């Protein structure tokens, strides 16, 4: 069976390196990429000038399907259906967290590498108690242009363990009292 992957990123991500790694990696990959600003990088990887919604592109171990830009509900369904999700921005990583599937987050690139500080703060909280370092290593590489085939193969080799850990981590966050409830408790206590 192939690894199901969603790809939603900023155009400055190392897309060519990721697609190369997927195409030359140790397992078949079926990648779903909603049409967005990175479409030119995908087209170039496959030696095309343009790509269109509905295109299915193949190279090596990689089969990539170009999807239309999705509504939020459709995007949530895509996240739930995939084994691994590449997401961008804060809203997408929140949605990926609730999908309870392993994900790699790309923060929006900022001057003076502030996005890397944001990434490190996120990784410190999200990956607390994760015995594996691969999600952190891959996330850093994705934000710093350092994706390699060996790093990709390490990530997919641990995907089953990462899936179990991610499900537990999502349950941990779901068990916490939400902000609205905390505010109600706070006001009821007369503070």
What are these regions (language model features)?
Residues 26-68:
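Catalytic donor nucleotide-activated moiety binding site of glycosyltransferases and closely related
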Residues 18-26, 123-126, 187-190:
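Hydrophobic, Leu/Ile/Phe/Ala-enriched alpha-helical segments that form helix-helix packing faces
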Residues 69-118:
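A donor-sugar binding/catalytic signature common to diverse glycosyltransferases
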Residues 1-41:
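Active-site donor-nucleotide binding/catalytic segment of nucleotide-sugar enzymes
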Residues 128-191:
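C-terminal amphipathic helix plus adjacent low-complexity
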Residues 22-27, 45-51, 149-159:
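Short, surface-exposed amphipathic charged segments that create phosphate/polyanion-binding patches used
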Residues 102-146:
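Nucleotide-sugar donor-binding patch of glycosyltransferase catalytic domains
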Residues 1, 23-27, 57-59, 77-81:
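Flexible, charged surface loops at secondary-structure boundaries
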């Amino acid at each position: 069976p192939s690894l199901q992957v969603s790809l939603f990123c900023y155009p400055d991500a190392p897309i060519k390196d990721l697609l190369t790694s997927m195409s030359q990696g140790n397992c078949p990959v079926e990648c779903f990429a909603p049409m967005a600003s990175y479409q030119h990088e995908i087209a170039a990887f496959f030696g095309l000038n343009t790509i269109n919604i509905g295109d299915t592109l193949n190279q090596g171990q990689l089969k990539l399907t170009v999807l239309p830009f999705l509504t939020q509900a459709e995007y949530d369904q895509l996240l739930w259906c995939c084994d691994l999700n590449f997401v961008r921005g804060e809203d997408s990583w929140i949605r990926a967290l609730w999908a309870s599937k392993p994900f790699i987050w790309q923060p929006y690139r900022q001057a003076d590498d502030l996005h890397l500080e944001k990434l490190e703060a996120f990784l410190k909280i999200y990956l607390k108690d994760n015995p594996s370092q691969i999600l952190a290593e891959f996330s850093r590489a994705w934000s710093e242009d350092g994706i390699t085939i060996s790093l990709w193969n390490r990530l997919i080799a641990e995907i089953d363990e990462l899936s179990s850990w991610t499900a537990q981590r999502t349950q941990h966050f779901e068990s916490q009292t939400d902000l609205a409830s905390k505010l109600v408790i706070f006001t009821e206590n007369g503070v």
